[in-house]
Each structure stands twice: as C-alpha cells, then as structure tokens.
Amino acid sequence: MRSFIKAHKKSTSFDESPKRHSNFSGNTNNSSQRSSDDSLDFLPSTPSQMNYDSIPPPAKHSPGFESFHRLANKTSKLFKKTSNSNLNSHLASTPTTSTNQTTSNSFVLQNPPTKNTGPPPPLPPPLFPSSSTSSFSRHDNESEYTAYKKTSPAKDFNRTTDSLPAIKGTITHSWGDSKVESHVIILNDPASPASNTSEATSSKQFKTPIIGNENLTSTTSPSNLEPAIRILNKNKGKQQENIDDAEDGSSKKEHHVYKALALAKNRNRQARIHSHDDIINLGKASQMDMSLLAAAFSGNSTTTINNDQSSNEQTDEKILDIERVTTTSTLTSSETTSPINKSPCFYSQTLSLSPKIRHGDLQSSPSKVNKNDSQNETLNKKKVRISLNRKEEEKVYSLNNNSDEYSVNEKETHKANDCNDESSENGDGDNDHDDDYDDDDDDDDDDDESEFSFEYAGINVRTSSVKYYSKPEPAANVYIDDLYEDENFDDDMNCIEDDESGNEGNEICGLSTRFEETSLKSNKVKKFNDLFNLSDDDEEEDGKDNSNNGDENESDNLYQKRLENGKETFNGNHGGHHDDASLGETVDNKEQFLINDNVKKPIQKYNDLFDLSDEDDNDDKEMSEAESYMFSDEAPSIESGPANAKSTRGIYSQSNKNIIRDGKPNYSFSLKRNNSDDETEHTSAIKASLTGTTGSTKPTVKSFSDIFNVDDSASDAESDSGTGGNNSNGLVSNDSERQVSLQSSLYETKSESHPPNHPHSQILQTPAKIVITPSVSDAQSQALAITDDDGEDDDDDTSSILRTPFQLIDSSHSQQPHYASPQYTAVLNSPPLPPPARSQSLKYHDLNCDLDSEVPRPMSNLFFIDEAEEDEYNQKSKFFDFDHYDIDEINGIPEDFNFSDSERDDLNRRTLKSPLRGGSKNREVSPFSSVSSSFRSTHSFNGKLTINQGAKELAPMKNKIELTNKTVTFFNSNNWNTYDCNSLSRKTSSQMRDSKYQNHNVGQNVEPSSVLSPQHQISNGLDGKCNDNYVISPNLPTTITPTNSFTKPTPEFSNDYSLSPIQETPSSVQSSPKRA
C-alpha cells in the first residue's frame, strides 16, 4: 500500500510539471478551435493522462489504469486483460442517456456530414471493451469536446498526439511497401472508439462514439470484446489547405523529450487485431465501401469511387441495396478529404471465409465528384459493388432474412440471385466500365491475385486477421497403406481389375487389355527402368492372347509352312505309309504351336533374361528324359536317310562358341502331353533306340554318389579304341540303324503328335539327368539339359536352344582330335561341376564372388550338392575327418579356407580332394575336371579377413586363467603337439647342439666361447624366431667363474619341462586358513 501511494504521488507530481503542463495547455488551446469538418478520426484506445485545465483533477487517472511511471520502469504488465465477469458488470452498470441507445456486437459507421452541418449533440460513452476498465462521466466528454479547434488534420495530429502518454515498444505488424503514399494498419491506435475516454486530441478519431443497433443479448459475445480496425492515412497532410504557420511554429518551439515517447506509443497502438466475428459484424452494420480496404492495402492514395457512375450500374452489375442505416452519429470530413472519407458505404453482408476480392472491384479511376451530390446520395441510399457467386448471394440473403431488425425485399433478392445471368446475357453495358467488369467475372476463379481470409481468434488474442497473400491448396497425397493387399496395381498405381470389368472399362476408352499387354511385351528392354515393366505373368498369358492379337495371320502362315514341310519330309522318307492324320492337325495343336513359338524366345542378350519366368519350368516338368534327347541335337535327323551318313548326334564341348553342325533338320516333332501312358511307352522306346546299339548301358546319375561312379578313364579307353577301329562305313551303318529304330519308335505309338514346331523350341527348362550313352564314335559322356544360354547363336535351327557352358560338337567327324590332344587342352576352358538334382539345397560358400554377374537365371534355378548326400557319401567312403570341420566351424573358418602355410594342408590334401578328380586317371582332359588345383586353393581366404576374425594360422593358446581372487598360469608339457613350420614337439637341431655342448663343457671345464662361433649363435637366434609357439631358444649361459663351475640361471622355460601351475598373486595366502 505504501509503494502504491508513493508511486501515485510521483506520477501526480510528474504530470504537474511546468514544462509538460504548459505544453499540454497550448495544445489544448489549439485543439479547441477544431470544427466538425475534420476528417475521419478515431477515439483513443487507452485513457489519456494529459493534465487539461478544463478537466477536473479526479479524472486525470482512470481507476484501472496504472501510472506512466510504473509502466516506464517495467514494473508491471503493459496490457491488462479484464475478465468477462468484470466486463459484463461494467457494461451493465454504464449509464445510457441517448434515446436511440442500444447495445450491439457490431460496428456501425455513420454518414459523413455536410460542410454546413452543425455540431453534433453530446453522445453517451462507448460500450466497447478496451485495454482498461475505466469509464468517464458525461461531463468529461462535454468539457473535452468544447476544446476542439479547426486546424489542419496532419499538423494537428503531430501536435496533439505528442502529448499522449506513450509506452515503449516496437512495431510488430506492417503491411505494404515502405513508400510515402502507402497506407499502413498500425496496431493499438490510442485514438480508438473502444476507449472509454470522452474525446481524444488526435485527428484520428471519431467525434462521436460508434454505437450499433443490435440485440441486447449479444453484448457479451466474443466479438464485442475486440476493438475495430483502425486505418491510418499518412497522406492527409498533403491534401489539406490553409495550414496555420503560427500554430506550426508554436508546436516546433515547445518540444519536449516526452513527445517522441508519446508519439511512438501512438504509432504503435493505432490499430488492433480483430476476430472473424468482428469482421462480419463490421460488414453487417457499417456503411463503408470495400474501397476502404483497397485504399489501405493497395498503396494508391488517389483512389476514389464515382458515386454517379455506381448509381447507374444497377442493371448490369451486382449491386446490393443497403437500407440498414441505423446509425446516430456522423462522420467528420474536411473540404478535400482522402478517398477513405469519400467512401460511400461498406457492405452489410456476411463475408465468406475466403472470398476473392479483386482490386478492380474495389477501385475505380479517379475523378472529380460533386461533394454535395455524393453526400446527399450517401444519405439516401448506399450501394456496394461486390463480386459474389450464386451460393454466396444465397447465403447473404438467407442471413438477412433471418434477422429480426428488418426484412429484405423480394425484388431485391430476385435481383441479386439473377445477377450472374444478367451479367452473362447482357454483354452491352451503359458504359465501358460495365463491360470490363463483366469480362473480369469470367476470370475470377483463375486469377492468382491476393485473397482475404479471416481467422477466428480468442478473446484478446493477437493473431493476424487479414492475409493478403494467396495460398495454393496442397495436392492430395496417395498412400499405399490405404490400398488393399488383394488388389493388383501397376507401377503407376492404377488398379488392374478383373478381366470382365477391365475389358468393359477399356472398351469405353477405345482400348483393350490385349492391346496394352501386347504393347507392353513388344517393348524391348532398352534401359534399366524398362526392367520393372516386365513380369512373370506376361508369358503365362501370352499364349492365351496371341490367338486374338493382330499377328494372327502371320502365325497361321508360319504354322502352315512348317506343317507342309513336315508332311513332305515325312512322306518322302516313309513312302506314304502314314497319312496326314498322323501329324495331329487340330486346333489345340495350333494353339500349342503358337504358345511355344512365342513364349520360348531365344536368349541372345542380357535383356532377354528378363523375358524368362518360373512358369516355364513348371510347365516343362512334364517332359521326360527321353523327350529332352528327342528335341536336342542328339536326336538324329529324319531327313538324313541312309545316303546321308552324317549324324547330328553330338556332345557338349567346353568352349562357348557356335555349334558345329552338318545337317539342318527341317522336320520337328512333339508328343501329346495329356496322354501319360503313351508318353511313357514312347519315351521308353526312344531310350531303347538311342542306347541299344551296343547292347550295354551305363547307369544314370540320379544322386550324389552316382557322380563318382563315372570313370573318365573308361571313356578315354573307349574313345581310343573306337577311333582306331571304326571307319566311315561303320559310322554310317550305326547312324542309319539308330535312325530306323527312332522312326519306328516314334510312329508305333497311338498318341497324336503335336503340330510341327521349331526343333528346339520345346527343350527342357529343368535340368536333365546326366546320361551316359556309350558309342563307338563318341569319345566322351554326354551331358544334356540346363536351361541357361550364355551365347549368341548364328544357326537358325539352334537359335532357341538353351545351352549350358558345354557346346555341341558333331561326333561323326572322326578326323577331329579327341580331348586327349594338346590342342583341345589349350583351347577348352574348365567347366563347373555338373548339377545334381533340382530339390537340393544351396550352400553359401559354394558360390563364387563373380557368380552374381555371370549367372543369367534366378537364384532358384541354381542347384548345388546337398550336404546330407555329401555326408552320406563320405561315411560310405570312410572319410572321417569331421573333427577338422568341427574346429573350423567353431573358429568361424569357412570350409574353402586354404591352409597353405601349414603342414595340415599337405597332410590332408589327398583326403580333402573331391572324389571327382581322384577317380579319373586323365584328370586334365576330363570334361568334368577343373584345373589341377582344388577349389580351396584357387578360392581360398588366405590373406583375407575371415568370418568373426577367425585365426588364419595356428596361434598359441591362452595359458592363463583369471579367477576372482587369483590368476593361474599353465605351461606346456612335452606331449603337447602343435602344427607349425618346425614341429615344436621336439627340440630343434640347434637346441640339441647347445644342450650337448653345455653338458660337455660343464664336465670338461671348457669355455663355450672357444667352441661356438658367432655364426652359430646367430643361427640359434633365427631358430628361436622361427618358433611359432613363442618358445625362447636357450642361449649359452654366461659364466661367472673362470673355471665355469657356476652358470648364471636364465629366467625362461622351454617345452622340455612340465611345470606346475604358478599362482601369480598373493591371494592364496589370504585364502589359506588363518590362525586364531
């Protein structure tokens, strides 16, 4: 309480200072000459602290206003927020004396008076909240009102606002460019109509408070708690005339330091932020035109509106008649006012959330207007030109119809609703401005100009209300999580529907699913991104769609040509014993031909690998082993009769060159797959015809152990004997017999054959078994199948065959050297191991690091030896070295690790070798043999980091055990054998010599220096360094006595002695039992 009294006394004495008192009194005298012709001004938002002579002393400070001294010292808050309860009680207790007084939650601007208008009657104080809860009496309003003086608005503004109490702060909001003629909305205008002071000395104020005429129940709404928009026009001083030089000089003479402070406060608090409700209420109850906002934001100070022109635009433009003029006060204006004062009206309709208001709708070309006519027209009727669509107009008039104050005429409503139709139909207006306005309506939705958006704000919350920038709407995001898993989508996230619905939708657009699929398949893979357009389902549906595509005629022609060639070849070789019906020319065969001709494409490039799919392997599982022979180059050509003795039966070579062939078979044949019984009989007949020439067959490789039963030496011996004993006549006879048996087996069956197809189009996609077919002319065993193709074919007949790294070589050429010759050993590369069965597992260490780029097929088609079969074979073959593998597995050493630096590799080399290479005598020339060195040697991890940083060579074991209370060290014994370069289980030769000389010298008293040479001592050091077990080589002891009777002991140990564990800490003494 004492501090409050002291601050009150200081502030009172501060306000009654001579300089400030004299300055304020001069300003008061000058302001007393003000008339009612001044421009549009606003009441201050904060109570004044000026010490006027005409104001009674009790009214210097409001009850709720803090002293300027405390505000300047920042000892309290700058702004006080009143609660709703106090505000409601204050509003309820405020006396009202006006006859037309009603409370309202909206703001109403009255008509500007004429020049000859008399002074307005005294009005009651405003009913709007402010930053303080103070209230003044009517006597204060009247006494302060009589002090006005007719002066220039700009000069009077500079004089009167300097005396206002100021609060230090910064400008937090500013709009527009920093120009001289720009209009700026300034926050917290002290000349605010929401202030409870009677009259302000600033020119920016109303002479009368702004009072609405709305319902009484809306006084406590949130919109009533916010002040109105205050707009400052900086260019008023340039438009005024007859400036009083004497008054200007008097204001410049008496300049106080507090004037700048008061002016800063006045500039920082000349406007306040509104909520959305306040903006709507302003539009409902006011008479201002939208050009008010246009003048504030556009920066054009000379913008005026021709009221005569707007009065003639009722027929062609959207003109809304506003008859809700319920104001009781008048707007002050000077002789030559700014365009804000000339504003005819403000529209009374509700603003939408974000209406697009163009500058062309708000502004018009400047023109000279008769002031009396414009004022009379403003008093009678106010017209507003706004651009609204039909929905907004309906909303506007629906709100007006629901109002209790008045009702809108039906004709006016009909006029506003038909506004768009009239503007579009009536292209010719009364003047040029109407035409421009109608043309601009079409582009209203497409312009990128600024938009006004109004946001909701809480009570006394400083948030931005007007956004004059446009904000584009963000594009809607599509998330994959919102899609269902069972639906199919392509790369562009287009749903692939079922066949029926998809066809219906595509036929409407003039497309079909077949066209899309064929266009997709026809595109070759040219870039990396094209790989993602391929799918495994393309080839599966290719056979179904090719019968209906645009290439049907070409397929029929190709089909007919191959069918006729097959007929001619068949009839020429067999003399017409079989008719054309045996070829099975049916519609199903034609479809099968089309499928096989299109699906199974030759693999000639790397891009062709992506045309393959796993469905091909599933379909080709039905083909048997004999069918693979029949459709490969091993199958003899039917075209070649007894006269043509050259057979196409060949084997695979080790080079990746073209196929060496003599004859080109023009006849192709296939089997009907749906007849399993006939297929079994047919395949058995073919096997007998192919392998029954010599009368003995070799078993087929069906498991892991069958691979090792193949002996390369036997095939070498047969090749030697067969090459020397047979001649060309024998080859011809053997080939002719094979052809006759094959032909008889082909047509003894009752199965219908498929239509002729490409000779190799139906080759197996799954790996076939390795079949050993002995022959006199053939030197090696023949490996058939594997679906991979890693080379380009120049031959047309072999273009679609899928080959292994082996190549076909015609075995009928007896003059060609066999594999034992040195020519082929230099040219031929070593092939990989033959693949076992399909259902066997894959070991990660069986893959080479370069296989990722070399393997053309998916990883699911790579087949490797099963570990279970390998272990079973090792058990049968009595290879028991599992301890070695177990230790390596524990240490994290891979199985293909090469122990080339130890004796272990030399001792176990014969046991670790693959049995494939041990069974053949001619290992270098075997078609299944690799290089002479093993895979472990060529692909070892020697010199590289191993898994889990495993040991790459033998390292000593840890000889210490650290327990909780002691550390135990163990030493090596004599019988502990290790693998190293010198076999440390026994002494080295140098150590043996050293020990012998030592014992001899001790017994004979001979100095060791005369016995050993320096070179020998150096060699002892080298032997010690070569010891991998870190056993220090014992050197000769240094003698102490001349007779060498005593030798100095050395603190070292060797492997020759077994020592007990040594406890290196005295913990054993502590753990021993203590005496009492």
From Swiss-Prot:
Compositional bias of kind Polar residues: 23-34, 107-117, 193-206, 214-223, 362-378, 690-701, 739-748
GO CC terms, sorted: cellular bud; cellular bud neck; cellular bud tip; cytoplasm; mating projection tip; mitochondrion
Any one Gene Ontology BP term: fungal-type cell wall organization
Modified positions (Phosphoserine) in chain numbering: S275, S354, S403, S407, S632, S676
Biased composition (Acidic residues): 419-450
Entry's induction text: Repressed by zinc.
Disordered: region residues: 1-66, 85-162, 190-223, 234-253, 357-450, 534-557, 566-585, 658-701, 713-762, 909-931, 1000-1020, 1042-1076
Comp. bias (Pro residues): 118-128
Ranges annotated as biased composition (Low complexity): 93-106
Cellular compartments annotated: Cytoplasm; Bud; Bud neck; Bud tip
The keyword Zinc is annotated on this UniProt entry: yes
Keyword terms, alphabetized: Cytoplasm, Phosphoprotein, Zinc
Subunit organization: Interacts with BUD27, GIS1 and SSD1.
Job of this protein: Involved in the integrity functions of RAM, a conserved signaling network that regulates maintenance of polarized growth and daughter-cell-specific transcription.
Protein name: Zinc-regulated protein 8
Source species taxonomy: Eukaryota, Fungi, Dikarya, Ascomycota, Saccharomycotina
The encoding gene: ZRG8
